[in-house]
Amino acid sequence: MVIEDNPNDVFLVREALTAHGLKVDLQVFEDGEAAIAFVQQLDAEDTRACPSLVLLDVNLPRADGFEVLRCLRSSTKCGGIPVIVMTSSAAVADRTTATALHADAYFQKPSSYDVFLKLGALAQQMLGGQR
């Protein structure tokens, strides 16, 4: 699951995952409120599975990434999903907050395409090497 409001970054996420051989069907949410509603819906339903990984932007409309992360971590069904917080922010406070909310990894979005592709390696590591 990708929670990202920038279509260019969503494209780069797909490229990074594909470059590392990860075959995933990405669900994309463009704002935090929609992502929170989805997690709450998953908690209410017995049959739907949680995503295996969440790639979460911090600066989102309607509800920021940290609100989404709080919701995920308090979820009875999806609370243990690996979450990679990805942001263009270099603020130490953002990294500290992500760590305090139990994000599994923090990825600062680079301006270089080649460096952005390293997100795929991080996702692969979070998924335990599955393809």
Where do the protein language model's features map onto the residues?
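Conserved acidic segment of CheY-like receiver
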Residues: 1-18
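Acidic, metal-coordinating helix/loop segments flanking the phosphotransfer/catalytic sites
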Residues: 28-53, 116-117
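Acidic catalytic/metal-coordinating carboxylates
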Residues: 31-34, 64-70
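Active-site residues of response regulator receiver
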Residues: 56-57, 87
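The feature encodes the CheY-like receiver
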Residues: 61, 91
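Short, glycine/charged-rich "phosphate-handling" switch motifs in NTP-dependent
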Residues: 104
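A Lys-centered signature of the CheY-like receiver
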Residues: 109
